[in-house]
Amino acid sequence: SLVSICICMISGFVSVIFTDMTLLLLVTIIFNVTLFASALTFANAIYAFGGFDNREILRLIKGEKKARYNFTVIHIKISFLFLFIGIVMAILFSLVGQYFAFYDLVIHSIAIGFIGLTIALYLPLMLPPIIGKIIHFTSLNKIPLLLIIISLIIRAVGDFILVQPLSSSSLGYIQISSPQILTYFFGSSGWLVVAAMLSFVIM
């Protein structure tokens, strides 16, 4: 993981120094691939997607502790999944073509899917000393998480079907009946994120 992070940093600095487009493309690909490798190795190091037998833990803990454990596991898995999707979109942006769909999904998958869900994961742990109130994990539900996932799915559908070609750059753009459709489509995605935040605060 540390080796991958070092390669990421070096390739990032090189991309700033050199201006040759071929070299920049190569460095960008190296950066994205090593970034993916570092994220993957880190996820593996914390057993984000398995590799650790937690059956004994689940058997011993109950109530609030079990709810907190399940809340943590679910949010870690889904947040890292969005991080991987974002990095893959960045790699496709470099290799396939600089389409808006890839660029848009990189930003939203990482900023909302990964960072947003990571913040949601730690907020119940950080807020009690600030607000002077204990947050009970048993009272938390999956509505904010589901709203975030639906929001990003809507975003992806809008990017790939309403805005961008389905595969290669030779296919051109898919026409939509009205630009307002696109506005409403992406707007609904944004409002779902707001709804997710509000529902999280209400919980």
Give the location of each predicted region.
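Hydrophobic alpha-helical transmembrane segments of multi-pass integral membrane proteins
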Residues: S1-M203
